[in-house]
Amino acid sequence: MTDNRYDNLGQLGTSTPLPDNPDTAALERVANPCDAPYMTRFVCPEFTSLCPVTGAPDFAHLVIDYVPRDWIVESKSLKLYLGSFRNHGAFHEACTTGIGQRLVKELDPVWLRIGGYWYPRGGIPIDVFFATGEPPKGVWIPDQDVPGYRGRG
């Protein structure tokens, strides 16, 4: 027996190639199955993109937190969307805030934040943060707890 609420999903349960770039990557959503407010966290410790100037690889640890309203993101589509940045040239700030803005556009969450903890290039780590506003009251919002980059120090 199949649940027709999920007929709109085109990636889950199928062999889906990695999209060429984030602009063409499909983010899929499903109806929020919960009535109570809650927070969902996605962690991508091996996010990659390319420097738009040199083409050198950039690496980040992403933490995405959101409080859903009517929709939740389907996790395989999120994984493929994030993977589509692998050969995409953009600065750290554009990647991090662009991911947050795309999720807001697709999901219309109560609240969302993303932390992009970028590994050093040229000796300088860059951390980029985006949020839609203050966290809602009555929902447990844990710290992202990603330590600052220390290298050998």
UniProtKB/Swiss-Prot annotation:
Keyword NADP tagged: yes
Single GO MF annotation: preQ1 synthase activity
Reactions catalysed: 7-aminomethyl-7-carbaguanine + 2 NADP(+) = 7-cyano-7-deazaguanine + 2 NADPH + 3 H(+)
GO biological process: queuosine biosynthetic process; tRNA modification
Family indicated by similarity: Belongs to the GTP cyclohydrolase I family. QueF type 1 subfamily.
Gene: queF
Recorded metabolic or biological pathway in which this protein acts: tRNA modification; tRNA-queuosine biosynthesis
Active site: C51, D58
Name the record gives this protein: NADPH-dependent 7-cyano-7-deazaguanine reductase
Organism per entry: Maricaulis maris (strain MCS10)
Protein's UniProt keywords contain Secreted: no
Subcellular location as annotated: Cytoplasm
UniProt-annotated stretches for the region Disordered: 1-22
Function text: Catalyzes the NADPH-dependent reduction of 7-cyano-7-deazaguanine (preQ0) to 7-aminomethyl-7-deazaguanine (preQ1).
Binding positions for substrate per the UniProt entry: V73, E74, S75, H92, E93
Gene3D superfamilies: 3.30.1130.10
